A protein has these predicted regions:
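Bacterial N-terminal signal peptides that target proteins for export
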Residues: 1-9
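Bacterial N-terminal signal peptides
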Residues: 8-18
Length: 113
């Protein structure tokens, strides 16, 4: 019985350590994203009066801290779809439906505007 309890406690400790390491990695990715794009968000806040914190939070969520396929390959940090009047570059990506049309930007700055 003592050995079983010992193994259970060791297993729980290992799981907790793994969870902590993953959370630290995620926090570091979030901090890097915020540091990298905060100036863009502040510029847009001045233009449109949307708080930079809200813009950054949405960008973090939609782009997976800049790690999503859309963010990496098309600089689309907000999951913005093409829409009927979009005439710029596009990329196809599976989202709510297969092969949906998303806007592709030359620079992340364009996604923030």
């Amino acid at each position: 019985m003592k050995h079983t309890l010992k193994f259970i406690l060791i297993g729980l400790f290992c799981c907790l350590c793994n969870f902590t390491v993953q959370a630290q990695t995620r926090n570091r990715q979030y901090e890097e994203y915020i540091h990298k794009y905060k100036d863009l968000a502040i510029d847009e806040m001045k233009r449109y009066r949307i708080p930079a914190s809200i813009t950054l939070a949405q960008g973090l969520l939609e782009s997976g801290a800049g790690k999503s396929t859309l963010a990496r390959k098309s600089n689309n940090h907000f999951g913005i779809k093409c829409g009927g009047d979009w005439t710029g570059r596009t990329v196809r990506h599976d989202d709510d439906a297969r092969n949906e049309c998303f806007r592709a930007y030359k620079h992340p700055r364009d996604s923030y505007e």
